Amino acid sequence: MYFICTYCNAYVYDESEGDPDTGLAPGTKVVEIPDEWRCPICGQPREYMQETSEEVFTEKRTRSKKRKDGPEPEKKDLVYYRAIARELLSGLCGVHPVCDGARDRVCSGQKYGKPLGVGGAGQGNTFHANYLALHKYKLKQRVVKEHFEPDMTTTVFGKEVVAPVLGCSMSGVKASMNDAIPEADFYRGLLRGAQEFGTIGLVGNTAAVPDHLGIDMVKENSGWGIAVFKPQSQLRLLELFELAEEYDAIAIGVDLDGCGSAIWAAKGKPVYRKSPNELKELVDSTSKPVFFKGIMTLEDALAVADSGAAGVYLSNHGGRVLDNGQGVVEILPDVAAELKGKLTIMVDGAIRTGFDVLKVIALGADTAHIGRPLLRMSLAGGADAVNMYYNYVKGDLRRAMIMTGCRTIGDATQEILISD
């Protein structure tokens, strides 16, 4: 009998053949598939397998074989790279049409001590809260004006970028991404793809590789990029800051919410909360712009400003360190009311499209940061795919600015928003 996974509508199974790649011997019936088995494409359990016709089975099998064995397609688009990412992240990420951390997503739910993959901490509520908070705001369509071509350019830490869109600082291929590619290649894709597009890439650091690999890759990229470090010991951070200055990085970041990192804890590498005095010491140690990431309250944002930092980065680590937290956008208006114009306000949190970018800019952000979509692109296609995704976002941002009457990024204010 023939079966198809009704979730991804791509994986097919013949009971007579079995599937050696997933450990199913010939003759294994669907009802006999072990509970721990997962669809190799979307990661769903056997309950999603339903009987199908021989015709559908053959068509799906032929299409899959052509993709694996045939020549590469002439046109490599986002759909092509997303399909590759779906295979690389099998069991961790379904590469769904909407990346929102909802309950029915492959990444969602408790992991019971296993690595988070690309999902959120606990039950994944904070990850989903990021999406919900952002989509409480709607864009106001305003079209009775003379036509114009929007100017999307802005300046970030003294560098002009083609749009206020940057990447998130990401790392952890071995622990969180099926060890799909080398960590250095992952960083390289993020940095070079951003540079080719005309913006600035960010990279993190992880416990599975030397903690200076990210800044080493920024050096390889001639200093065009930003390394963001976990809140390691103060002594080690000062050493990493010195390296970043030596390599002429654009700026330096510290991922304060990394103090809740399960990956670093599992590796026996301590990470720490940081006091206001420690923040100031880090800022004073370098001539480079410094920002602190992981800020989710106005109180913490004001402490960052008092340290002399050049930027405050509002983030809950993609919902990966604290469950049942607020969505990032929920705190943005209050922080912007106090700090807009005093330092760079950086924001992430389920930002996927140029329409999302315009919303957070209108709420007071200076830069909008994209995470999981760029993660998938760097794994699947390196710099080319990352650059392609940035251009996709830029196209949406251009359209959003035209439709809301924003000639420049500075014209995007709360006047173009409607909130639920």
Predicted features and spans:
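C-terminal helical cap(s) of enzyme catalytic domains, especially alpha/beta-barrels
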Residues: 268, 324-335, 377-398
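An N-cap/entry alpha-helix motif that binds or orients negatively charged groups
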Residues: 61-161
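Short, cysteine/histidine-rich loop/knuckle motifs that typically chelate Zn2+
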Residues: 7, 40-41
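N-terminal functional module of multi-domain proteins
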Residues: 126-212
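Short, non-ligating residues that shape and space the ligands of small metal-coordination modules
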Residues: 14-15, 48-51
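The −1 position to Zn-ligating cysteines in a subset of zinc-ribbon hairpins
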Residues: 4, 12, 38
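Alpha/beta enzyme core
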Residues: 232-347, 355-372
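Short linker/helix segments within small regulatory modules
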Residues: 21-36
